[in-house]
Amino acid sequence: MSEDRQSRSGDGNKILYCSFCGKSQREVRKLIAGPSVFICDECVELCNDIIREELEEKSQSARSSLPKPKEILEVLDQYVIGQQRAKRTLAVAVYNHYKRIESRHKNDDIELAKSNILLVGPTGSGKTLLAETLARLLNVPFTIADATTLTEAGYVGEDVENIIQKLLHKCDYDVEKAQHGIVYIDEIDKISRKSENPSITRDVSGEGVQQALLKLIEGTVASVPPQGGRKHPQQEFLQVDTKNILFICGGAFAGLDKVIQQRCNEVGGIGFGVKVKSSESKRDVGKVLAGVEPEDLIKFGLIPEFVGRLPVVATLDELDESALVKILTEPKNAITKQFKKLFEMENVELEFRQDALSAVARKALKRKTGARGLRTIVELVLLDTMYELPSQEGISKVVVDESVIENKSEPYLIYQTMPAKVASGE
């Protein structure tokens, strides 16, 4: 390092020594000089070995903490009712995505491609909940973006890079954490182009947004202002590499089933040879969507390049009355469990009769809101009771049946039995 690590040979030349192991330049193959320090090739090799071992340990630790597809499915089952096909697809896709990130630390000739996910299913079928549950299970940053608010850069609206800014905000601007997060882009079907043919005029909220999202989804280095500041030329930007961010896009894709049926020659046509299908033989929308092909999505209005960036497609079924009743009662954070907990805090028991649950499910089906509308229905029914309850005494139980859900009667209030002495006035 200093002069004491240098000496002179018999011929008067200085002999240099490695600042780390102390070997002279004559004992090693190569001595690399730095600002007032030297390091030999043997120490460089040793440092490389240490770093390699640490990376391997980190990789093994990540691999052991990464839940397997069956374990992912078990957790999803606790929060999302039904949708087994979609849950299995997601479990495998997410597991493979994070395995792919691990493999990047290894010196491997084969580079695994990124597999982003497209969720296709009716409103309120559980698309957002699936993405949220996955992020919570994997303990990674998660954000939701609405595709309908996005526009091309330079137009009024949100730039696609704002999505990454939201993700950074969720993890206190820790770039390393954000680069392994999950982004859910909702209403992706709303940015489909208006016709199959490429548009001559500018479509800033449709095809233009798809084009803008391409690089972000595939993997690019996005420049994001720190701490949510606005962009200006003199500002330093945070550089976020999106190649390891998992993008999940979701949409209802209303009318996609007709596109699929048309391709399968099940609907339409002119002439005597055409089979006329009655309304009774109409196929279930969920089963039709399960047969979706990339060409159907392109015909619907997604550009081919965008479809290519979403190789994993999971379809969700429309929820029926039975599924909605299960959603009300079975998940870990089921709506009825949440309201029971609220009433429990007032030392009151809340009971939902079976006919009440069925009535709530029927109402949600009628409104075509899926599982999303269940909470609103229950909230409205119990609103007056929750308003009065904290001010009333002696209530031990509240009962809700079908007539209450159908607004034919108020929730039934059951009072505690008063002791005989109190009742007689003694």
From Swiss-Prot:
Residues 6-59 form the ClpX-type ZB domain. GO terms for cellular component: HslUV protease complex. Component of the ClpX-ClpP complex. Forms a hexameric ring that, in the presence of ATP, binds to fourteen ClpP subunits assembled into a disk-like structure with a central cavity, resembling the structure of eukaryotic proteasomes. Belongs to the ClpX chaperone family. Zn(2+) binds at C18, C21, C40, C43. Keywords: ATP-binding, Chaperone, Metal-binding, Nucleotide-binding, Zinc. InterPro entries: AAA+_ATPase, ATP-dep_Clp_protease_ClpX, ATPase_AAA_core, Clp_ATPase_C, Clp_protease_ATP-bd_su_ClpX, ClpX_bact, P-loop_NTPase, Znf_CppX_C4. GO terms for biological process: cell division; proteolysis involved in protein catabolic process. Gene3D superfamilies: 1.10.8.60, ClpX chaperone, C4-type zinc finger domain (6.20.220.10), P-loop containing nucleotide triphosphate hydrolases (3.40.50.300). The lineage of its organism: Bacteria, Pseudomonadati, Pseudomonadota, Gammaproteobacteria, Lysobacterales. The keyword Chaperone applies. It comes from Xylella fastidiosa (strain Temecula1 / ATCC 700964). ATP-dependent specificity component of the Clp protease. It directs the protease to specific substrates. Can perform chaperone functions in the absence of ClpP. This is ATP-dependent Clp protease ATP-binding subunit ClpX. The keyword Mitochondrion does not apply. ATP binds at P122, T123, G124, S125, G126, K127, T128, L129. One of its GO terms (molecular function) is zinc ion binding.
